């Protein structure tokens, strides 16, 4: 009997296997239960499981979890997709080669997602790999795309390479430059999306380095249709984005390209672009009229002082709010000073000079630049950026001694005894005496280094609160635990008329509005500390204003009574009360009768009100016209006899030793109106 592995047995088995696969290849109705591993093992082995070399091949169980798995392809071919078999990334795949279908092996068609219905079919092909061939022709057959097989030369081609891409020449400073080149170079040459790397071999500074002539770019002109599948027009690596589809990778890369080049071209240069397809490179566009150190500052300035970003057209006196800075590179901080905001563009002259900016090599450029003073050299860059650079590290370098809280409490009692009557001063002293034992117990074991560290923490906390007060729209105060003013915002100065320098003790306090105090019958002798303070006040340093000097008598007493309860009580607690703030006035009080005792308030002179408003507007942060309108219908309407009816909410910030360190006060004022019956409402 002939063996099963005879000459006719193996051929019959291969023929039968091939016929069975041919019959089941494009059958959509018959289910396929055989795995691809089983089919390939049947093709390569005899019925006995012996291959042509005589070695026995191990047949893996399809359900065995330890069997080797094939790498999943990103997209199956059309034949493997219909047969529901495992395919590979190569084209043609191994299965189509073994079946003789390598000529018709092509990518299968996937169902479009909803967000890709408007996408062209060319953009839905898989992510480009090393087999990408931009010159490969594509044709349509039966609604499907057919790609030619890429050659071996295309597999070793780099990702950004073109067969017809021109090389960029590099010129050194020693080579000759074509005549008439610099005259045709525009000042604001825009860079092409294709950004090759230029290496400068010259040792000269960059301002007078190499100048490259305009070269032809391989990018397609914008007037002609371009191929979105060509990655060279966007100059980014699509394979490195790890996207599953070519369309998503191109969209993400294009958004990144647009965002990276958004700040390259200023809006002033939108009408002076170059021709498409020409790339102008050159570091010597500015000529030799400027210093090398002036180039970074010169490039960061706005083009003209009268452009759309300038603020010089604002009218004086108008009620302007916090103005937007002059441009993206402006160094001016928002403010509402009396002077009108000026454009922050600074350069070589007060007016824009088109000759200097657009024609740097003109004959008259050198003489004009020499005749004008170089203002840019005199500007200190550190001083300009000082308003924007807030670094709290200087606190730990400058604070070398602790704050004298004992002397500050002595000054507070001097103010209380000189401005307040005896009953009110006694009530405030009683409130402070309630927290005195707790303060002494907390500071008993503290060393000098602890006190210095306590002051550093106070300055660091105040540093943060100053930013909060600047951004807050409500009048805000920051005080020490003794009541000295440590920080204030502009809203509070506009409300009360107290300037920041007076509140912080940088200027003498000349306020004469004492809240309607009367003259004592028995004068009090000045102490030794008061006499020394008056004689050597300037030498003793700044003397900030106490919070008790900003309130009338009843409001100050109520504040210190709340302070005695909140100082060592709830650390998150807050207090809200009504008060009367005193307006800052420097008029000399009229010589009234000296026999009045108690709290009789002085009546202001009606004729002196316009003069006082005019004086207050000079020191106000508002302009003259705004201050005049404000005096008639604004904040000045709220004050009665030099007092403002307000409501304040304050809380205490403690330090690391659980002692009251800083309390912050937010003020809110009321609008009063009279009803039909003459009753006053808030």
Swiss-Prot record:
Start-end of DNA-binding region: 77-105
Top-level taxonomy: Eukaryota, Fungi, Dikarya, Ascomycota, Pezizomycotina
Keywords, comma-separated and alphabetical: Activator, DNA-binding, Gluconeogenesis, Metal-binding, Nucleus, Transcription, Transcription regulation, Zinc
GO-annotated cellular components: nucleus
UniProt entry tagged with the keyword Zinc: yes
Family the entry assigns: Belongs to the ERT1/acuK family.
Name of the protein described by the UniProt record: Transcription activator of gluconeogenesis PODANS_4_8760
Top-rank taxon: Eukaryota
Basic and acidic residues bias (residue ranges): 29-41, 54-67
Subcellular location: Nucleus
Main subcellular location: nucleus
Biased composition (Low complexity): 9-21
InterPro entries on file: ERT1_acuK_gluconeogen_tf, PAS_13, Zn2-C6_fun-type_DNA-bd_sf, Zn2Cys6_DnaBD
Annotated stretches, region: Disordered: 1-72, 122-148, 181-211, 325-375, 509-541, 586-622
One Pfam short name: PAS_13
GO terms assigned for molecular function: DNA-binding transcription factor activity, RNA polymerase II-specific; RNA polymerase II transcription regulatory region sequence-specific DNA binding; zinc ion binding
Reported function: Transcription factor which regulates nonfermentable carbon utilization. Activator of gluconeogenetic genes.
UniProt record, GO biological process: cellular response to starvation; gluconeogenesis
Biased composition (Polar residues): 185-206, 329-345, 354-373
Protein source organism: Podospora anserina (strain S / ATCC MYA-4624 / DSM 980 / FGSC 10383) (Pleurage anserina)
